């Protein structure tokens, strides 16, 4: 999947319609797994958003519940949570690769699933990586409440605008959001600077 994704990115760049330094990636469900894998195994993306997350050793086999853990063991052949499954998890677990990930990551999650992201979020945060999490109350895998959808879509646009274009919405209601994001950016001096676009 990653090879196909990167081929599409390369083609878009070759057409002259995308700046290779300003490529973003987003995904929900299996698409979020693709985002995570891409962040671990590629440095092509300058910003990312996931709407579900994550496949990490402890959370998948613990916080997803016993039925899901049993299914993951039986169908996907996931190792037990009590086993050392580092070799299995390393290619796909954000928590085990947090030191390598530089891409700013926004996690927009349903409250029924956010526990699955805590291991990755904590690892990225502890490594001082640019990561932010928002949890929508009363939501499930796919958002159903219009206000939550609107808030997430607006935040997606703002996140990509900030990290890919250096753009900030002057709306005073978003001041705290941009203060947080500037702090994330400023804490990572090795992130490439993006010139502001108006």
Residue ranges and their predicted role:
Residues 1-198:
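Active-site-proximal cap/loop segments of hydrolase catalytic domains
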